[in-house]
């Protein structure tokens, strides 16, 4: 049986990979969706979240996915209270309930709205749900593409702990982190991990964007502290949400910036277009008439392909990034 290896802290777990039909090239595939967290009043979900869930299920059936990456703001507007909070059932389990999704693991990180509630409860829910994987505020995943020696590392961050909280519905920069020591510890951990990473693809994921032309714009804290690490250590891509639209940007070092924050709301704002360096923006979609969307990522021995999918089923944009050169 094909398998992948996942490293959560010091724990190594072997998990089965889905078989992708008769695909000629073995791949690792996943869906990345952010800001999908419904609403705090009945029915605890939105039409956009439901549409995204339906299209994610269809995409999993037709294109394949080994897991789903949640990019934060999992429960609007103030997170959850405890691990038995009904929002887990009403905003997550009951929405992403299609048969195609029942055995697909989710790897989760926290957004600013999650931090207005109890993030520890979201971590604890990992012991309750067979799908929900959130082992700690920040952690490492490692995958091996079946029948190859190609490896993928993903570093899941807590950017709220790094930079502080902010208002998701106002153009605010994050305030200072609540605990500077905790922020420095996470950044130091990431730096050491990236310096040691030998994988063929290295991805970093967090809630806040580094670059964005939309309502919140570039996150200055991350431009200062995280962006240099991506360039120095040859990171393939940074995935995020926070702004409620879909964007793809790429810098002069070849780092891709995948913004997928259209799981529950859509915002057409491009108010920070001039705050992003010329030539970085390759794609933006924020139509208020849209039901939102997400990204589908496929990693092969040759390249990483990213497709932006609207909840209606339409493919909006496709791009690819090369495998990192071997040392």
UniProtKB/Swiss-Prot annotation:
Residues spanning the membrane: none
Its subcellular locations are:
Lysosome
Residues carrying sugar: 118, 149
How the cofactor binds, per note?
A: Binds 2 iron ions per subunit.
Give the EC number(s) under which this enzyme is classified: 3.1.3.2
Question: Which Cys pairs does UniProt list as disulfide-bonded?
Answer: 163-221
Question: Which GO molecular function terms does the record list?
Answer: acid phosphatase activity; ferric iron binding; ferrous iron binding
Catalytic activity reported: a phosphate monoester + H2O = an alcohol + phosphate
Identify which cofactors the protein needs according to its UniProt entry. Fe cation
Conditions for induction: Induced by TNFSF11/RANKL-stimulation of bone marrow-derived macrophages.
Q: Which residues bind Fe cation 2?
A: 73, 112, 207, 242
Expression by tissue: Characteristic constituent of osteoclasts.
**Binding positions for Fe cation 1 per the UniProt entry:** 35, 73, 76, 244
List, alphabetically, the SUPFAM superfamilies matched.
Metallo-dependent phosphatases
Family matches, as InterPro entries: Acid_PPase, Calcineurin-like_PHP_ApaH, Metallo-depent_PP-like, Metallophosphoesterase_PAP
Gene Ontology terms describing biological process: bone morphogenesis; bone resorption; defense response to Gram-positive bacterium; negative regulation of inflammatory response; negative regulation of interleukin-1 beta production; negative regulation of interleukin-12 production; negative regulation of macrophage cytokine production; negative regulation of nitric oxide biosynthetic process
Q: Which GO terms describe its cellular component?
A: lysosome
Using the UniProt record, give the first listed, main subcellular location: other
Keywords carried by this UniProt record: Disulfide bond, Glycoprotein, Hydrolase, Iron, Lysosome, Metal-binding, Signal
Signal peptide (residue range):
1-22
SUBUNIT field: Exists either as monomer or, after proteolytic processing, as a dimer of two chains linked by disulfide bond(s).
> What PANTHER family does the database record attribute to this sequence?
TARTRATE-RESISTANT ACID PHOSPHATASE TYPE 5
Q: What does this protein do?
A: May play a role in the process of bone resorption. The osteoclastic trap acts on nucleotide tri- and diphosphates with higher affinity, compared with other substrates.
Q: What is this protein called?
A: Tartrate-resistant acid phosphatase type 5
Say which species the protein is native to: Mus musculus
